């Protein structure tokens, strides 16, 4: 008699910088979602795959939620996140720093209205110095979610992830596995490399040009020594933006190249050569009334 298998779709939601990318990477034991301390560097839903014996799930990293959204790009990301919540079997609701405000309540209300299975997870417990605040905070959340598990973890330190995984497995629907057991993500190398370069540049630029560049025409080759040879083009709207990305004496773009190489080599375990060219294409962006740029491609 064939044993039952379990498969489901999971999304991690929460504010910016609560550790969503770190948690995804630690659960699937692979660095597919690039981690940055700067807020809002995750713009796309990164999909990881976990498989262990009879259990398998897709797990989605999502852009960080905010109390206010300043442009149509941010608003679209959040609409996409809510749509994905609607399509998911289980929601991991990640919180930290004793923050429980309107956006958290709004997310929870949406999840409960859709009658979704969910787990509230308090992350970064290793950084909590005032332990006496923890119990009142848990009790506060419990008033909004009386029937939910509240699990305390440290994703970075891999503390109590086994408890989280046990709870996830209990909630997975019975279904056939979708992927081979060794697969960690649906994305190919080129996409992940593009994400690494994009997030590295966003980290270096911070708020200067967060939405005002596109990474295009990524070419990935391997030489006879299995070394990555990567070439990509960064497209900007005008000369001023190009100068900002290049930086004084080329320092910023050189940092982007060096930091990206380091992350690519760590992720793929391959020596890497990276070349970046910056081009100006004015028609790639259209300026909105609020002064923000929208990708018009």
UniProtKB/Swiss-Prot annotation:
Region (G1): 14-21
Subcellular location(s) of the protein: Cytoplasm; Cell membrane
Residues reported in the UniProt entry to bind GTP: 14-21, 123-126
Span list, region G4: 123-126
Keywords noted in UniProt: Cell membrane, Cytoplasm, GTP-binding, Membrane, Nucleotide-binding, Ribosome biogenesis, RNA-binding, rRNA-binding
UniProt main location, coarse: cytoplasm
Membrane-related topology note: Peripheral membrane protein
GO CC, one annotated term: cytosol
InterPro entries (alphabetical): G_ERA_dom, GTP-bd, GTPase_Era-like, KH_dom-like_a/b, KH_dom_type_2, KH_sf_prok-type, P-loop_NTPase, Small_GTP-bd
Keyword Thylakoid carried by entry: no
Region of interest (G3), ranges: 61-64
Signal peptide positions (record): none
Swiss-Prot/TrEMBL GO biological process terms: ribosomal small subunit assembly
NCBIfam families according to UniProt: era (TIGR00436), small_GTP (TIGR00231)
UniProt function note: An essential GTPase that binds both GDP and GTP, with rapid nucleotide exchange. Plays a role in 16S rRNA processing and 30S ribosomal subunit biogenesis and possibly also in cell cycle regulation and energy metabolism.
Protein name: GTPase Era
Organism: Buchnera aphidicola subsp. Cinara cedri (strain Cc)
């Amino acid at each position: 008699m064939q044993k039952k298998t379990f498969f489901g779709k999971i999304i991690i939601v929460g504010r910016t910088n609560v550790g969503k990318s770190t948690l995804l990477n630690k659960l699937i034991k692979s660095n597919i979602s690039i981690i940055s301390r700067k807020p809002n560097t995750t713009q796309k839903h990164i999909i990881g795959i976990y498989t262990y014996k009879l259990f398998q799930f897709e797990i989605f990293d999502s852009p960080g939620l905010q109390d206010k959204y300043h442009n149509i790009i941010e608003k679209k990301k959040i609409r996409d996140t809510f749509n994905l919540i609607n399509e998911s079997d289980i929601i991991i609701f990640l919180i930290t720093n004793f923050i429980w405000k309107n956006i958290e309540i709004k997310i929870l209300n949406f999840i409960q209205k859709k009658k979704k299975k969910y787990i509230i997870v308090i992350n970064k417990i290793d950084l909590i110095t005032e332990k006496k605040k923890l119990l009142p905070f848990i009790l506060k959340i419990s008033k909004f979610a009386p029937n939910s598990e509240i699990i305390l973890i440290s994703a970075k330190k891999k503390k109590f992830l086994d408890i989280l995984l046990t709870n996830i497995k209990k909630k997975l629907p019975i279904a056939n596995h979708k992927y081979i057991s060794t697969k960690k993500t649906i994305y190919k190398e080129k996409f992940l490399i593009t994400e690494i370069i994009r997030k590295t540049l966003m980290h270096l630029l911070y708020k200067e040009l967060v939405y005002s560049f596109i990474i295009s025409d990524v070419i990935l080759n391997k030489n006879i020594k299995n070394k990555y040879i990567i070439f990509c083009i960064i497209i900007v709207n005008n000369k001023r933006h190009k100068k900002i990305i290049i930086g004084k004496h080329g320092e910023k773009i050189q940092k982007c190249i060096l930091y990206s190489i380091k992350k690519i080599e760590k992720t793929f375990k391959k020596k890497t050569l990276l070349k970046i060219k910056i081009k100006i294409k004015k028609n790639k962006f259209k300026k909105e009334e609020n002064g923000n740029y929208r990708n018009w491609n």
